[in-house]
Amino acid sequence: MKKKIEKHLIGLTGEYFVAGMMSLKGWVASLTLKNYPSVDIFGLDPETEKTINIQVKTTKNVKSYQVGVMRSQRPEINDRITCPFVFVYIDKDNNIEYYIISRNQLIDLILTTDDEYYNRPRKEPLKDYPIAISLKDLAEFKDEWLNLWK
C-alpha cells in the first residue's frame, strides 16, 4: 500500500474508533468532512447540551505525535490549538490506546516538553521544527475521556 494512503487510512481508523468510544459513553460524535480545518469530530453531550470540536491524531507503531505547530509558531499556540485532542496509539498487534487531553492541558504540555527539548545541549543550534508530543508524556491522560469536556 502506498505510504500516503496508508497514513490516511490510519488517521481515519483513529477517528472512527474515537467516535465509537464517544458513542459508547452516551455522547454524540460526528466525523467532519476533510475540508474542515483542525477539527475531526464534532461532539455533543445530550445531557448537558454542550458541544465540542475534537482533533484526533493517530499513529501505528510510532510513539510520538506532531501537533500541527512549528517551533516558530509558539507565540500563536493559543490560536493554533483550539480544542481538545485525542491521541490514538495502535500497536503492532492492532491494540488501541486513547490519550485524551483538554486544550489547556495540551498547551501546557507542549510548552513544557518543547522547552525541555529545545534547551538540550547541542553542537548545532536547532532550525525550525514541528513540535511533537511523545507517548510517554501523554501517559497520565490515558482513557481520561472527561478531559474532552474541560
Residue ranges and their predicted role:
Residues 1-37, 42-150:
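Mixed-charge (Asp/Glu-Lys/Arg
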